[in-house]
C-alpha cells in the first residue's frame, strides 16, 4: 500500500500573482478548474503535484484589505516523486513573506522542518 508523508506549510503570496494563486486554488480544491497551462517546472511533471494538498485541511485566506494572500497547505500523501521539495522550489520565488512548515514520513522517527526566508 505504501507509506504516507504528513506535511504542513504556511506562507503568503502577492494578490497580484494570479497564475500562482490559480494553481494553488486548483491544488487545494478539486472543484476549481485549472484554466492556464502549468509553468515549465519539474513539479508539474510529477505524478501527484495536483493532489498533494487535497488530502488535508488546506486553505487560502484572501482578505480584501491585504496585498497578500495567506496560504496553509496541510496534507497527507505518498511523496514518492519528491513533490514537497519540488513544490518548495517552485513557490520560493513567489513568496511574499517567509515560509515555515514541516514534513514527516510515517516510516521515519524525525520530522523535517522547512524555513524559506522571504524577500524582505
Task: Report each predicted region and the residues it spans.
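Charged interaction segments
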Residues: 38-120
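Short, extreme N-terminal segment that most often corresponds to the first beta-strand
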Residues: 1-33
Amino acid at each position: 500500500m505504501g507509506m504516507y508523508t504528513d506535511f504542513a506549510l504556511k506562507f503568503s503570496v502577492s494578490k497580484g500573482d494570479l497564475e500562482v494563486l490559480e494553481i494553488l486554488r486548483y491544488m487545494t480544491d478539486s472543484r476549481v478548474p485549472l484554466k492556464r497551462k502549468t509553468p515549465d517546472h519539474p513539479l508539474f511533471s510529477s505524478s501527484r503535484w495536483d493532489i498533494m494538498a487535497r488530502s488535508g485541511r488546506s486553505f487560502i485566506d484572501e482578505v480584501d484589505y491585504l496585498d497578500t494572500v495567506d496560504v496553509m497547505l496541510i496534507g497527507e500523501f505518498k511523496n514518492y516523486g519528491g513533490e514537497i521539495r519540488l513544490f518548495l522550489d517552485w513557490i520560493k520565488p513567489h513568496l511574499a513573506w517567509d515560509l515555515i512548515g514541516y514534513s514527516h514520513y510515517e516510516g521515519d522517527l524525525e520530522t523535517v522542518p522547512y524555513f524559506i526566508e522571504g524577500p524582505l
